[in-house]
Swiss-Prot record:
Descriptive protein name: Sulfate adenylyltransferase
Site (Transition state stabilizer): H199, H202
Pathway: Sulfur metabolism; hydrogen sulfide biosynthesis; sulfite from sulfate: step 1/3
Catalytic residues as annotated in Swiss-Prot or TrEMBL: T194, R195, N196
Keyword terms: Amino-acid biosynthesis, ATP-binding, Cysteine biosynthesis, Cytoplasm, Methionine biosynthesis, Nucleotide-binding, Nucleotidyltransferase, Transferase
Reaction(s) catalysed (UniProt annotation): sulfate + ATP + H(+) = adenosine 5'-phosphosulfate + diphosphate
Gene Ontology CC terms: cytoplasm
Sequence similarity: Belongs to the sulfate adenylyltransferase family.
Amino acid sequence: MLSPHGGILQDLVARDAEKKDRLLHEAQGLPQWNLTARQLCDIELILNGGFSPLTGFLGKEDYESVVQNSRLTSGLLWTIPITLDVDEEFAKSVNLGERIALLQDDDIFVAIITVSDIYTPDKKVEADKVFRGDEEHPAIQYLNETAGDIYLGGELEAIQLPAHYDYLNLRKSPAALRADFATQQWDRVVAFQTRNPMHRAHRELTIRAAKEHNAKVLLHPVVGLTKPGDIDYHTRIKVYKEIVKRYPEGIAQLALLPLAMRMAGDREAVWHAIIRKNYGATHFIVGRDHAGPGTNSKGDDFYGPYDAQVLVESYKNELGIEVVPFKLITYLPDKDIYLPVDEIDGSVKTLTISGTELRKRLREGTDIPDWFTYPEIVEILRQYNPPRYRQGFVIVVNHENPKRIANALLSTFLQVGGGRQYKIFDHQGQPQLLELIPDFVKSGTGLIVTSPLPSSVDAHNIYELNTYPSAHIKVSATEPVTEIVQKTVFFLEDNKFFQF
C-alpha cells in the first residue's frame, strides 16, 4: 500500500482525540463561524486525512504558491487551493492569532482554527490560473458570486467530523479504508471516481482495469458538492449499491467521498489522484474530460478531452499512484460483449446510448435496453426522472383575467386527471412561497400560477401563457376562455404531460 501524500496520514480527529473535551469546552466561549456547504466538505477531508498533508486552511503564501505553481511552499504537489472564505464584516472582527470555533448548522462544533493569516485574494488570478478564466465556469461563478472576499488561514484542531445521518457504513475515512484493505489483503487497488450513475460499460471498464493491473476495485463516488444539475447523491448511491452486487465476489468495494468538486479539469484530476492515494488506492482511473464541467454557452469545451490524463501522467513520479487512462467502451450486439473502441474493427456493428439519449428515454418513458444497464438501475433512475406524463409542471397565467383562466384550467385538469395533483398557486405579496415551487414540480404537481414568476425561481417545466409572441402558450387578449383552455391542454399533450 502506498504512503499518504507527504508521507504521513494527517488524521486530526485521531491526533486530537485526547483533548476533544477540552477543545469543545473552549469552543463554546470563542467567536464562531458557521461553515458553508463547501467548507464542511473541505474541513471533513482535512480532519480525516483525505487532504493530507494539509492540517488547516491555506495561509497566504501557500495559497499563492498553489494558485501559481500547483505546489505548497514546501514544494509538495497540491493543485487546488483549500481556503476558508469569510465576508468582510466577519473578517473585521478577527485578529491574527485568534482562535475561532467552526460550526456545522450553527449548532455542532467541528473544529477550532488558530488564525495565522487574514488576506484578500486576487480572485481574477485564482480564476485564471486554477480554472482557466472562463466566467461561465461554475467554480468561477461560485468564486465571484458566493465565496467571501476575505480568506482566513490557520491550523485546525479537531473536535469531531461533520455530522452525517445517512449511509454511515459507506462513509469510510482514509484510515478506515486503509484498514479494510489491509484486513482483506488488498495490496493493489484501482480507484474509480464518479459523480454520475454507473452502467454496464462502467462495470466492464473497472473490471478490465482490475484484471490488467492485478488489482481490486474501489468505487469511490463523490457525495459532496458536484456540478449544478447533477443527479442527487441519494439516487446515485442506490445505483452504486445495486451495481456493486454485479461484480465478482470479493473484487469490489463501495465507499463514499465527501468532496466538494470544483470541476477544475486537469488540476482537479491531479487532486483526485492525491486524495485516492491518501485513501489507500495504488491506481487511479482518469477519465476523458475528467472533472470537466462540459461546455459553455457558446458550445466551447472548458477543457480538452485528454488534458486531465496528460497532466496527471506528467506528475506520475511525484504522485506515486499509477494512472489508468479511461478507455471508451462500447457494446457489440452480435457478440453480446463490451470492448474498448480501440480494439474494434471499424466494420463491426456497435451500439451505444449517450447521456442525452438516456435522459430523453427516461423523460419519455421509452425502453432502455438491458445491454446498456440493469433493469434495477433503470427503475431507480425512473423514480428520480419519471416520464413527462408523471412530471409536475407550472403554467404561469400572465393575462388580464388570470383568476378566471386559472379556475377554468384547474377544472379541466382535474377532469383530465393524469395521476397528478393540481393546484392554483398565488404568491402575490408572499414571496417566501416561491421557494415551494421546485418542490411542487418535483412531487409531480401541476401548478397554475396567477402572478408572474421572477427569473430566480429554479424549477423545471415552467411555461408562460401570455399574449407575447415569445410565450409558450400564445393567446390573444380577446380570446374566449374555452379556447385558451383548449390551447393549454393541446400544448401539454404535445409536450407529453398528458396522454389521451
